Regions:
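Short, intrinsically disordered, charge-balanced linker/junction segments flanking boundaries
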Residues: 381, 392-393, 405-411
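HEAT-repeat alpha-solenoid elements in large eukaryotic scaffold proteins
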Residues: 1-15, 30-35, 47-60, 75-82, ...
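Extended amphipathic secondary-structure runs
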Residues: 18-58, 185-224, 228-229, 247-276
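Core helices of alpha-solenoid repeat scaffolds
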Residues: 12-35, 68-76, 113-124, 179, ...
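Helix-loop junctions that connect tandem helical modules in alpha-solenoid scaffolds
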Residues: 34-46, 59-65, 81-92, 106, ...
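Extended heptad-repeat coiled-coil alpha-helical scaffolds of eukaryotic proteins
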Residues: 32, 299, 361, 368, ...
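Short, charge- and proline-biased low-complexity linear segments
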Residues: 175, 202, 296, 391-394
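Alpha-helical repeat/alpha-solenoid scaffolds of the HEAT/ARM/MIF4G superfamily
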Residues: 1, 15, 107-247
């Protein structure tokens, strides 16, 4: 044996994992073909289907545990495709419902969830579709109904109405698959992920949210991934130029955006500040984009979500020499500047000013580096061409000077 073979043959945990990974790299492709073939055969009985589904799920978990990203993404995408939810309308059979349970069940396996990486995207897209279909099945208003623009009906609207009628049948099948509590648990498990794991989870949830905001459908193919440059000083996150409005404003959804609020709320005081800062840079870039949505109601909703999170974040005092508050409040600056230049966007700008005024009144004693972001927005708003916006800004500045000047300039 040569030295390399001898080194590899030494019994150690690392070598065992490496050997398992090599074997799995050879086996997962043929295994995927066999399991997929079994699931595609409509006339197979329940037992072959159950065995194929179990094999596909175990294979996906193994790929994640061995950190084989390509294999994990391929296996998870296969599971997602067999749900029939992540794509155009198809009839949902019992085997498809079982695939939904198996796919979302991957998130309950710690080693699997931690290493899902880019495979979170198909999982979260299917979770979003299940939640939407559950609402349709119960007859409740879906979130897109609250943000639909009023306009004369056109051919596309009639096509959309027909599609919704077709989806009603699929909604009844999806309703029995998972409960609302099990969907909530999927997002609650983000608290158990590592700093790296939760950052990737949040980035993929942002991708789902961006697709929903663009078309109302998380499986539309629209993807929003942050480049590494977004997470560095001087990257897109720190660039305060106006942002392009997101997609078609006619029928956006905000379900994933609300889930982002929930995930941020669950993690804000759980994570060390440095880990939270990395996670927030991903969230902040997306919230700033949502705050520039072409649909003013959606933009206002995104700003209000930021207000809720800011009230909770600012409840904890900032240590000296840190600037976490400034980074946290920066999306308000980006959203305000992105909404400048149009009188039609004045209500959104006015709401941003009102939100910052609320933050000052409620959390002034806790604010440190955040003053820079707050005063920056109020300064821009004081010169706004819309009188209501400029007047609200001057009134907010007046309250800061009258009651909180010692906090703004303690020296």
């Amino acid at each position: 044996q040569d030295s390399a073979t001898e080194e590899f043959s030494k019994p150690s945990p690392a070598n065992k994992v490496a050997a398992a990974a090599k074997m799995f790299e050879v086996a997962w492709g043929p295994g995927l073909s066999a399991f997929s073939h079994a699931l595609e055969r409509i006339f197979h009985g329940p037992r072959p289907t159950a065995l194929a589904l179990r094999g596909l799920k175990i294979s996906a978990c193994l790929a994640c545990a061995l950190e084989l990203d390509v294999a994990a993404l391929s296996l998870v995408n296969a599971l997602a495709s067999f749900t029939t939810l992540d794509g155009p309308f198809k009839v949902m059979l019992p085997r498809n419902a079982a695939c939904v349970e198996a796919l979302l069940g991957l998130t309950a396996v710690p080693d699997c969830a931690e290493n899902l990486g880019s495979a979170w995207l198909p999982v979260l897209r299917v979770a979003s579709r299940v939640a939407h279909l559950r609402l349709l099945a119960t007859g409740a208003r879906t979130d897109d109904a609250y943000f639909t623009s009023t306009h004369a009906p056109d051919e596309k609207e009639y096509a959309d109405r027909k599609l919704r009628d077709e989806e009603s049948a699929r909604a009844l099948a999806a309703h029995s698959v998972l409960t609302d509590a099990s969907l909530d648990e999927l997002y609650a498990r983000s608290t158990k992920l590592s700093a790296v794991g939760v950052e990737r989870f949040v980035a993929e949830l942002c991708a789902v949210s961006a697709a929903e905001l663009s078309t109302g459908d998380p499986s539309s193919g629209t993807q929003y991934f942050l480049d590494e440059s977004d997470l560095r000083p001087g990257g897109k996150y720190d660039d305060l130029q106006p942002l392009p409005a997101l997609g078609d404003p006619r029928r956006p959804r905000v379900a994933a955006l609300q889930r982002l609020v929930d995930v941020a709320d669950m993690n804000v005081h759980l994570r060390p500040r440095l880990a939270w800062d990395r996670m927030w840079r991903v969230l902040a870039a997306h919230f700033a984009r949502a705050g520039a949505h072409a649909n003013a109601d959606v933009a206002t909703y995104a700003v209000d979500s930021l207000r809720q999170l800011s009230l909770k974040f600012l409840a904890k005092e900032e240590l000296k020499a840190f600037t976490f508050q400034r980074a946290f409040l920066k999306p308000f600056e980006r959203a305000f500047r992105a909404n400048q230049g149009s009188l039609d966007r004045a209500p959104v700008r006015a709401y941003i000013v009102a939100c910052l005024d609320v933050l000052v009144q409620a959390r002034a004693s806790k604010i440190r580096s955040g003053w820079k972001s707050i005063l920056g927005v109020l300064k821009d708003a004081s010169g706004d061409p819309d009188r209501a916006v400029s007047q609200a800004a001057f009134e907010a500045l007046g309250r800061v000077l009258d009651h909180h000047l010692a906090l703004v300039a303690p020296d």
